[in-house]
Amino acid sequence: MKAAFFNGSGQMVVSDHPDPVPGDYDAIIKVRATGICGSDLLMNNDKTEADELPAGHEVGGEIVEVGKKVNKTLIGQRVAIETIGQGRACESCWFCRSGQYRQCTNMAAPEGGGFAQYIKRKAIGCYQIDKNTSWAQSALVEPLAVSIHGARRGELKGGDKVVILGAGTIGLTAVVAAKQLGAGKVIITARHDQQAKMALNLGADIALNSDSPNTGEEILELTDGRGADLTIETVGGKNPATLVQAVEFTRMQGRISILGGFRTPLTFDWLKPLLKEQSIHFSSCYGVIDGK
């Protein structure tokens, strides 16, 4: 099959790669859509050697083959794929039995991701989508799950005033997650006009310019002078700017949920969140939702 690889020089190249072969509990999925995550771009920029396996973890496709112990009726199903969690989890360690497959201590070896014509994952990590869901939408299921998990890690409560830092894919899906989980007001910071418009279309109440020096003052005005009950950080990167903003924009005894991937060690003033008695939660990928 054809697959795309980061070549270690900041470029992606297409070349031949062996077709995946299913194990007993696996499914082979013909890839129909793969999203490009910000983490893919950050890792590509950091690489100095070519990848041996294709990346890509926001994937939707059609099951075309299954292993010996998988129900054959799954063939032909349209699915979104949990590439990192159940798709590779052992299902027997303490974390798997607790429903936290992303934290599996016996994770199967990487098999390659969705920047390829086909991908192999455990069948239990494939979630059926209906015929009215487009392939592009199927690739958004994974980042939406990331945002739902992050909002839950931040203990979002009904009526909360929520600030979302960043309006990329994770920030935009965090708008949907926060609204569906009962947020009373959702304020998002966006760098580009088209991001702000999309955030408002998805349900954000207010979109602010992330580069404005007045953003902090505006957030205070919009939150009755207190600050956000919960701030969801979705940017990450190589400097602590959005971490500093998260502390600034969040009220005393408020909560911060960090979804963004920070790629280098950072210097950060921990005294400020300590004095404000803020709770800081880190969130990686996704877990079960209400036991499902």
Go through each PLM region and give its residues.
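NAD(P)H dinucleotide-binding glycine-rich loop of Rossmann-like/cofactor-binding domains
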Residues: 85-165
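Mid-domain Rossmann-like dinucleotide-binding core that forms the NAD(H)/NADP(H) cofactor-binding site
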Residues: 133-213, 217
